Curated annotation (Swiss-Prot):
Pfam family, one: PGM_PMM_IV
GO cellular component: cytosol
Record's catalysed reaction(s): alpha-D-glucosamine 1-phosphate = D-glucosamine 6-phosphate
Transmembrane segments: none
Post-translational modification: Activated by phosphorylation.
Cofactor: Mg(2+)
EC number annotated for this UniProt entry: 5.4.2.10
Name of the protein in its database record: Phosphoglucosamine mutase
Length: 444
């Protein structure tokens, strides 16, 4: 792992790339960097349900305590819950052990600053440099100066109460199927919905350490789509492993993606005078239908790179408070400092309740243009992306689309993949283009 930090912290195969030794080093370096500027000398740690979380958590705790910083352990909790508690508990930093939607063999370590925001690149670089430097002179306190380990017994309760308070309506009369991805949402998502009055049918809510994201959750919503229809539910919700995203399913079993959720939430916020700057921040992956739907409603759309950290940066830069990604990472900055699948689900459900419309009716406000995505595994994604062959191929195929579509080729921020997206009106033409682009990328 030549460069540790990617777009969403440090990721790798647990115990080969992301080892206990590396976690220990990251704990030492992170605690030193994030608490030396007068910030609180306590760090909170939370994780998802992966089997490797125990090992990495123990190593991080040891590293943090070894530089004289206290650890407050909160156990399994959604990533946005850790961001929230970092702020609420007055910690100098928060640490999340999770690889989000990735398979079980992967894990990750991500830091939040004292305000609950992901770290800027320069702080991550400082932590990385110290973690990799065998000669780094970090503190080695002794005796009573060592850090201690504490347990936050009511962490789940605190996050549940916080999330519930973000909407002013109950959910009585709604029958909801919720897919917890056998991940961090398993204890909180069904409970929150139930306490707000919904009839809740949880699925994939029994984590065993190895079944996280396994044919379930927001990256595999097929079972949820079937279950919503089978149960006669009003809608379904699908979280990923760390519950920082959500997708929905209407009563007919149709998937409602992040773009559609953003359109209906943005329009509802605007109708209540609560859409700050009359702006929604989206990424280059958002569907053309989103742009058209928001433009029809007189809402300004600001575009940024893929990744919720870039959505957040653009929100802070523009003063807007709402934005997100097609994948279901959606930020309501008036509520939390990062993408929050639980809070997004609650805002969506509040729109359903307050408008009296079904999710199918609401989602129909956006016409989704056909979009085909394809991932190509590569050895060196940067080499591929810098090849002039790619830019020439994009120009050639976009000429064929004649202004009625677009092609986007980008590297994954967390995996050795190049992602291809082709969008337009003719599915056969799109499939032909994406297959040809994938072949070109694979041969570079």
């Amino acid at each position: 792992m030549a460069k540790l930090f990617g777009t969403d912290g440090v990721r790798g195969v647990a115990n080969t790339e992301l080892t206990a030794e590396l976690a220990f080093r990251l704990g030492r370096a992170g605690a030193h960097v994030l608490t030396r500027q007068g910030h609180s000398k306590k760090i909170i740690i939370g994780r998802d349900t992966r089997i490797s979380g125990d090992m990495l958590e123990a190593a991080l705790v040891a590293g943090i305590c070894s530089v004289g910083v206290d650890v407050y352990k909160i156990g399994v909790l959604p990533t946005p819950g850790i961001a929230y508690l970092t702020r609420k508990l007055g910690a100098g930093a928060g640490v999340v052990i999770s690889a989000s939607h990735n398979p079980v063999q992967d894990n990750g370590i991500k830091f939040f600053g004292p305000s609950g925001y992901k770290l800027p690149d320069e702080l991550e670089s400082q932590i990385e440099k110290l973690a990799l430097d065998d000669q780094a002179e970090l503190p080695r306190p002794t005796g009573g100066e060592l850090g201690r380990l504490y347990y936050v017994e009511d962490a789940v309760d605190q996050y549940v109460d916080f999330a519930k308070a973000t909407i002013s309506t109950d959910l009585k009369g709604l029958k909801i199927v919720v897919d917890c991805a056998n991940g961090a949402a398993y204890a909180v998502a069904p409970r929150i919905l139930s306490e707000l009055g919904a009839e809740v049918i949880p699925i994939f809510h029994r984590p065993d350490g190895v079944n996280i994201n396994a044919h379930c959750g927001s990256t595999h919503p097929e079972t949820l789509m079937e279950e919503v229809v089978k149960q006669g539910a009003d809608l379904g919700l699908a979280h990923d492993g760390d519950a920082d995203r959500v997708l929905a399913v209407d009563h007919l079993g149709n998937l409602v993606d992040g773009d559609q959720i953003m359109v209906l939430c943005a329009k509802h916020l605007k109708s209540k005078g609560k859409l700050r700057k009359n702006t929604t921040v989206v990424t280059v992956m958002s569907n053309l239908g989103l742009y058209k739907a928001l433009e029809r409603s007189g809402i300004e759309v600001v575009e940024t790179k893929v990744g919720d950290r870039y959505v957040l940066e653009k929100l802070l830069e523009t003063g807007a408070r709402f934005g997100g990604e097609q994948s279901g990472h959606i930020i309501f900055l008036q509520h939390n400092t990062t993408g929050d699948g639980i809070i997004t689900a609650l805002q969506l459900l509040a729109v359903v309740k307050e408008t009296g419309m079904s999710l199918a009716q609401l989602a129909g406000q956006m016409e989704r243009y056909p979009q085909i995505l394809k991932n190509v595994q590569v050895k060196d994604k940067n080499y591929v992306m810098n090849s002039p062959i790619i830019s020439e191929a994009i120009r050639r195929f976009e000429r064929d689309l004649a202004g009625q579509g677009r092609i986007l080729v980008r590297p994954s921020g967390t995996e050795p993949l190049v992602r291809i997206m082709v969008e337009g009106k003719d599915m056969a033409e799109l499939q032909s283009i994406v297959d040809k682009m994938a072949e070109i990328v694979g041969n570079i």
